């Protein structure tokens, strides 16, 4: 099953200090993930946001793919409006990970069994021309993000680009179109880790069964 159950608690003015706190737990048939993030949207009245996050993720794909992964880490970063409607985000993240395999795993997968440490520099470019963030009716949003390996065994370089356009038609109707592209490659020619392989988010697929090829 591809069903995901999520519990989350969000607070936009924690302790009356304007801090944003976001805690979430996600459960699926193959994974459990916990996230905790704290954001100061206007650090020292500089119009720059400062954020800190922790993440723990366990992915169990022993049944279908012969491996299991446990990953824990955190990040710290800042985001600010560099030009009108154009925001720049810079952060760094650290993760430790353990990958286990069983007898059903391929020889290539078995070679990836072990412990890993990764440190990334993360960049985000966000150009937002929507008329409003919620219940958008017109405009577009273009987003590009990249994770650059600083210390890593596989040296995986990840790119993400999304583009979404909103057009109003027939009075109260809104047509939404979007483009999604993501890639992961090792800049040193290594095999990327099993946990870093790209999958299309289930919310972007319709009529497909999770973990399989083709429509239901």
Segments predicted by a language model, with ranges:
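Gram-negative/organellar outer-membrane beta-barrel architecture
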Residues: 1-143, 156, 167, 173-175, ...
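Short glycine-rich beta-strand segments
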Residues: 57, 145-151, 182-184
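Acidic, glycine-rich flexible loop/linker segments
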Residues: 152-158
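Short, solvent-exposed, mixed-charge loop/turn linkers that connect secondary-structure elements
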Residues: 185-190
């Amino acid at each position: 099953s591809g069903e995901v159950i999520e519990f989350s608690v969000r607070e936009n003015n924690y302790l009356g200090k304007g801090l944003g706190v976001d805690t979430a737990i996600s459960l699926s048939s193959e994974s459990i993930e916990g996230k905790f993030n704290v954001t100061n949207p206007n650090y020292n009245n500089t119009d720059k946001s400062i954020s800190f996050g922790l993440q723990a993720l366990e992915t169990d794909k022993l049944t279908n793919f012969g491996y299991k992964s446990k990953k824990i880490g955190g990040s710290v970063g800042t985001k600010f409006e560099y030009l009108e409607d154009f925001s720049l985000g810079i952060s760094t993240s650290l993760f430790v990970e353990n990958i286990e395999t069983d007898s059903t795993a391929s020889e290539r997968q078995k070679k990836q069994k072990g412990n890993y440490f990764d440190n990334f520099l993360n960049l985000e470019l966000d150009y937002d021309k929507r008329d409003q963030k919620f219940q958008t009716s017109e405009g577009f949003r273009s987003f590009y993000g990249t994770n650059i390996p600083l210390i890593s065994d596989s040296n995986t370089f990840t790119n993400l680009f999304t583009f979404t356009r909103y057009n109003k038609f027939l009075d109260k109707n809104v047509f939404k179109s979007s483009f999604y592209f993501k890639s992961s490659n090792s800049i040193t020619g290594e095999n990327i880790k099993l946990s870093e392989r790209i999958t299309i988010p289930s919310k972007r697929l319709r009529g497909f069964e999770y973990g399989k090829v083709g429509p239901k």
